[in-house]
Amino acid sequence: MTADNDTRDWTEKYRPVSLADIVGNDAAVKALRQWAETFGTGKKAVILYGGPGVGKTSAALALAHDMGWDYIELNASDVRTKDAINRIAGPAAMAGTFEGTGGRRLVILDEADNLHGNYDRGGEAAIINVIRNASQPVILIANDMYAMSKPLRESALQIQFRAILSTSVAKVLRKVCANEGLKCDPEALMKIAERTNDLRSAINDLQAAAQGSGQVTVADVSTGDRDVPETIFKVMGMIFRGKNMREALNATYGLDENPEDLIGWVDENLPREYQDDDLERGFEALSRADVYLGRTRRRQDYGMWRYAGFMMVCGVNRARRRHYGGFSRYSPPTYWQKLGRAKSTRVTRDSIAAKVGKACHCSKAEARSTYLPLLRFLFDKDEYAIRLSAQLKLEEDEIAFLLDAKKASKKVGEIYKKSRALIEEEIEEEIDLFARFGKRPGKPEAGEPRESLFMAGEEEEKPSREKSAKLDAFGEIEKPKRKRRKAPDGGAPIEDGPEEPGEAPMAAAMPAATESFGPAGAPAPQESPLPEPEKPPAAEDKCSKKQRTLFDF
């Protein structure tokens, strides 16, 4: 490949395509290839860890190329919240390829050791869940593996990528110069390789030196040295065992740690390095540093950080009077872990309280104070624990909190598994009920024999009048006609004939119109009409019509 019109960054332009192009980490490449070829028999995920620019991301992409796998990558520019991981990485790790050919899809998560900020809250737990349920290979890339939680480290195979030798870096730089048509001084290339700690930085420095010219000389690369960031472990060694306190103090300026964090590291590892009087003097200097930090917080005067840094570095360094041999493994402050565990416990407790409050129609505070102790008591019986876990849809960490047990314990796993099975059964019952909804019980399906709508032993009862009824031309019941005859006194004709079934004749039911209620031969007395009640005059109505309406109930 030549320069020509290709304006890409050289680190991307010369990124290795195959695993065979990865330099300086043959053992790591071999282990990575073996994991891919035997996928399905061991760990579902692998952690590639090491310093920046040693080929971790390039090895992951080259592996996908060599194995013929699709890949999806989440890097530092992506949002790594719990929801984002479950939405993107989760389906990608469980589904097939985009083409549906049945091949593998590689899920790559870069900077997996930086899932500790507020914006990535819940991301690490989501990654563990993705790995547990994955059917596709997953690669996690990290600079500091020990910044990741222990459950996450144990869920994956660990492969370390070491720093590349300067001779190997210079060899790659010579190939880049040849492809770009540059005249490069071998001494200049070696100088670039020695002053950088990684291949990516070396290629960037080479591109910067060759900008605007067709050659790279020693003068071009001697204009300045690259600032190399120090690691906290190296600085700890310089503080406790270094002979030059000025070098140790200058090394802290390259740390990505503030004095509030650095004093925690020194306080945690000081008893592992010093003994007796040296330990006493070291803690005395450390206490003076803490005084300055307290004044900084109270007065908001961050100029006092320099005094705190001087006491925690130079003061501790000069407290040593004798030499201590052996190897000491430095560790981060344990109170960070305690704070993390306490915070995780509070989050789990509040999550359970929110679910209980929703089910019991009460506030989260009331559920936390009233119902959580009752739940702990009920969870002593497995039957109640399973049913309550299914009803509240509790996760494993929530079940472990109520049982006061570890999340990885056998009992927690069994209760979680049985509760999920119970939830699935209820869902299936709801689906069956919904499928039967809307069907008429008396209407037979296609191909089924038609049955009566009435239960066995019941007979259809119809009104007796409908038994003898006839229908007219409009489909209505035709009433029987009555015969008309003349009255004996020449009055109005009288209807006679069949009555409705069950009806007595009209003449038998009512007295005759000419029947007398008085003595024989005397005419019936005439009743005088009752006088109608007089209406009150309008003047006496003291309430208006509107008022009468209001009080008229």
UniProtKB/Swiss-Prot annotation:
Pfam families: AAA, RCF1-5-like_lid. ATP binds at residues 50-57. The keyword Heme does not apply. Residues 503-513 have a biased composition (Low complexity). GO terms for molecular function: ATP binding; ATP hydrolysis activity; DNA clamp loader activity. Residues 442-451, 532-553 have a biased composition (Basic and acidic residues). Residues 438-553 are annotated as: Disordered. GO terms for biological process: DNA replication. Gene3D superfamilies: 1.10.8.60, P-loop containing nucleotide triphosphate hydrolases. The keyword Mitochondrion does not apply. PANTHER family: CHROMOSOME TRANSMISSION FIDELITY FACTOR 18, REPLICATION FACTOR C SUBUNIT 1. Belongs to the activator 1 small subunits family. RfcL subfamily. Part of the RFC clamp loader complex which loads the PCNA sliding clamp onto DNA. This is Replication factor C large subunit.
